[in-house]
């Protein structure tokens, strides 16, 4: 099973449709659970660290002992699509649950990064939160097509 925990929601219909399409495609190979954590209102907190701490508490409630946690972070390791597929294959073939965590516009608290088994960076570029979620789903889908030998990845 794959769980995707996201801080914030997708607002634009076309991004929602893209996410749903990838989740539908993936459903033939794995169960996908998406959890949206409400992004905290910056005006309620004295500083960003307090805001991130509150979001981290909400995220950690959805991560169980023994789950393999992958956090997306600009300073993480960059993987090729083939390496990402190998990671998926290693974990899914053993029946392990993988949890992908996507931070909000303020990033993620250190507590989440410390809980991670792996920090991954797709790029040094900054992406809009909603678009990044689609990129994650696409890479998970691409990974499974590589694993299954389906012609999609070139």
Curated annotation (Swiss-Prot):
Matching InterPro entries: Alpha/beta_knot_MTases, RlmH-like, tRNA_m1G_MTases_N
Molecular-function GO term, any one: rRNA (pseudouridine-N3-)-methyltransferase activity
Catalytic activity entry: pseudouridine(1915) in 23S rRNA + S-adenosyl-L-methionine = N(3)-methylpseudouridine(1915) in 23S rRNA + S-adenosyl-L-homocysteine + H(+)
GO cellular component: cytoplasm
Location in or out of the cell: Cytoplasm
Amino acids binding S-adenosyl-L-methionine: 103, 122-127
Presence of the UniProt keyword rRNA processing in the record: yes
Record keywords, A-Z: Cytoplasm, Methyltransferase, rRNA processing, S-adenosyl-L-methionine, Transferase
Major localisation: cytoplasm
EC number: 2.1.1.177
Key word Cell membrane present: no
Pfam families the record matches: SPOUT_MTase
Similarity-based family: Belongs to the RNA methyltransferase RlmH family.
Assembly information from the UniProt record: Homodimer.
HAMAP family for this protein: 23SrRNA_methyltr_H
PANTHER family: METHYLTRANSFERASE, RIBOSOMAL RNA LARGE SUBUNIT METHYLTRANSFERASE H
Role: Specifically methylates the pseudouridine at position 1915 (m3Psi1915) in 23S rRNA.
Protein name stated in the entry: Ribosomal RNA large subunit methyltransferase H
Record organism: Caldicellulosiruptor saccharolyticus (strain ATCC 43494 / DSM 8903 / Tp8T 6331)
